Amino acid sequence: EVQSPIEDMWPGEHKIEEAIAHIAGLTRQDVPQERRCSYFCEEGAVTSELSDIAASLNCDVLYSAGLYLDFLPKGINKGATLTALINHLELNSEDVMVAGDTLNDLSMYEHDFIGVCVGESEAGLLEATRSRARVYHALEPGCGGILEAISHFGFLGEEGISAEVREPA
């Protein structure tokens, strides 16, 4: 199973909360948090002490968009997890396209998936993927950027998205 190795490495959110309780400027995000702890923070809160705490718990710290801080099991990221899932499902990775907008998504592009940085992406992500031929930088944000990339990479053939338009019944 894909999740078991991640679960085995996860120290638990309570250990992380206890270890960083004394650090000012961290606010827990109100998002689902299985095998990760997510916080809002200011850039100054990301210190070597914070990184050392994460390392002592066998975790990585990921800071993105000048606002988001995630504690994840060491070596676990979107790219590695997606690769494991694709292998588990026996899919062809060339049939997969990834999309992102912050540095939290960088690992997917580092695993050499076809991908899109949607419009309004974080500058750091755009810079980190600029030289990757398999990553398209879209103009439109969100779903619009994904549609741009589907067309750019030819996922729907020569006619593209227009072939998918259906007549009203």
Question: PLM ranges: what are they?
Answer:
Residues 1-14:
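Glycine/small-residue-rich loop that forms an oxyanion/phosphate-binding "nest" at active or ligand-binding sites
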